[in-house]
Amino acid sequence: SFIEHIEPYYFNILGYAGSDETVQSLLINFTKRCRENTGSKFQLVIYGKTKVNYPGVISIKNNVTDTGAEKGSLVYWLTGKEAACAINASCTNAIYDGEYTVNTNFKQYELEQAVSDGMFMFHNVSDSVSGNVLGDTRVLTDINTFTEVTKAMNKDFTLNQVIRVLDNAAIDIARLFNRIYLGKVQNDADGRISLWKDGIALFEEYQRVRAIQNFVDDDLPVPTQGEEKTAVLWTFEIQPTACMEKLYCTVVVA
């Protein structure tokens, strides 16, 4: 099957433009299993699926109006856009430059409700002052389907930029470990301090490109030995950065 063939490979985004609920459910379960059990950190982009409530799944509400086209054809564009998006960037407000005609016929309250429900939305943005009366089709906000916010997983986890940072951190740490330490460096204090120093360098680079903020060395403790002699345990904190989306102004009349 497709899933069996793709599972061994590294990729950032998986997309399915169809509306078959059986296939959608299969891919959602595959995404959850890979993210939580095998360490494969990718997101799934699908069309029209509601109440998914999972940071690893992005569901587009808008359909396309082109004759003969799959209603969920925006999945193709968004799959590429999300895959190409850097960890210090967001797809929010990105102009849709694809070949399909997007249905953006949503009222403001409908847009707000859709976002509240975890649906990825495109909307029309015009600027009559500049002469752009027709407007552009843009991404409203770069979110995933996660909606049931808790103390352990706050609203930050609804943002795809945050998920990108966390996923890439997991991938980069794993690659660092596999490339330099796996089967090569002893699991003693000196070996774990060496791993810690490389981790510090990695997250200093994350902070340099503004993917994370407020990082200090103390956020990354030295790894410890696990229950087995070959096991290394590492718990640390990072604070992903997010792009500006909302502006609140107070005008004081002098």
Regions found by a protein language model. Give the residues of each.
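Structured, hydrophobic secondary-structure cores that serve as assembly/anchoring elements
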Residues: 82-254
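Extracellular Cys-Trp
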Residues: 1-101
